[in-house]
Amino acid sequence: MEQYLVNTAKKPCAVNFIITTDGSQVPVYIVGYDPINPNTLYFRSRFRITGTEEVTMRCPQSPRMLKIIVWSEGNLPYRLSSVKLLPLNALKSQEPVVMFVEKFSRQAGRLWPGNYTADNVPFTIQYKRNIYTDTGKDHPTPARIHTELPIIQVSKSKFNQMTIPERVIILLHEVAHNFINYDQDSEKESDHNGLNIYNQLGYPKIEAINAFADIMQ
């Protein structure tokens, strides 16, 4: 396991890694997080590396200092020859809804359960310890939007385990249902509309895939 502390200065950036393995499809894990604030992961992904490959993790948001941990599955041999901080030219949205989603996603790990609002944002986030079904069981979804009221319920217990990009795509998906879609009930349309904004903001595609895969499980 290798650890690094990178001065990202709260600016958009990308972190580039050059990784070499002796074997084929060696699973290598890369995690970046805020060492000061709890439950604040900026990225967390697994890559299957063969030979020498470059991996770049995009961070439209970053902490003052980013702690990075890299390791391989089963302690298989690998070499990390470069960790480089790069500028990230991504869209910085001034749209209140998107700014609210990004800020909440960044701070969710340390926020208490409660109601959260923002100026010029047409909905409230109800941050709950857990979301329950009508029968009182733990709901599998990390967030859901009310079909009639401007409320998005978010599970703190599930958001605490998610990366910031995963939180962003989940919230954008829910926002799309009521405020972007032509068909409010269409999951496919919400996926498309949420991903369109997410990609414009510059977040890693692999984190969106991870978020949807976790929900499907």
Identify the role of each PLM range:
Residues 34, 89-147:
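Auxiliary, metal-adjacent structural segments of Zn-dependent hydrolase domains
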Residues 126-164, 175-181:
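Active-site scaffold of zinc-dependent metalloenzymes
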Residues 185-201:
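An active-site-proximal "capping" alpha-helix that borders the catalytic cofactor pocket
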Residues 201-217:
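Long, well-structured alpha-helical subdomains associated
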